Amino acid sequence: MLLSLLLACPVASDEPKDTANDTGSTEEVTDAVCTEATDVPCEDEIISDFSLHDDKTSKGDIENTEASGTWSSIVDATAGGSSSASKNAWIYAKFTENGLEKVDIDDETALQDMTWHIAARRYIIRLNGGASGPSCVGAAKVRDDFNAVDESSATDLEFKLEDFYTEACELKEDNSGMPGSPATQLATFWEYVGSCVGTTGQVWVLQLESGELVKFTVDAYYADDGQEECNSTGSTSTEGAMYTWRWAFL
């Protein structure tokens, strides 16, 4: 028995592995936070409350540009418009060395899938972990200055998983005042400015299931110059849910 246990245990090495993986750059490999999917609590409730589908995937696309290690990702989470969003799927994505990549899966499959990190539909963004998915992607709020956030900023952070259901599977709502709006970890990326969705500039550090860290902020909810118009005037005629996400590996 002892021999079998010894053979089953890999020999530890003091040398860092300098290999690339599918979620980050070619850096020293970090310790994984989780490697196996866990059951999503309140699964029936999230399917109903979030209008999840098992027969369709998002038609939205993701476009990436990169400069000095910082990515700007335009994410189409329009889902057919505000009046049709509940009839359409969420868009799922993962952070990789090649940019933010779409994960083409349906909503109910995503409840058992660890390959995605982040999902969006209209003004709601959720992470793969806790009440939202089977993985362990967590978020910690940091300062509002994206450029000032570096690896030292991640010291002693408490990464929180999605926790928008009570033990009785009742939905916890955010502070927006919008009925049925869940208190997701990234919910404070926006606030009402007049009649539109204004961005707050809040920055988070996200911890992926691999242990890699990503600094993340929402630069815009609206396409083109719509966000600047909203933030400064309180209204905009530009299409919403055409996000611009800014992020970088730490």
Regions found by a protein language model. Name each.
Residues M1-L6:
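Bacterial N-terminal signal peptides
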Residues P10-S13:
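Bacterial signal peptide processing site
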Residues P16, G24-L250:
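Surface-exposed, beta-sheet-biased, low-hydrophobicity segments with strongly acidic/polar composition
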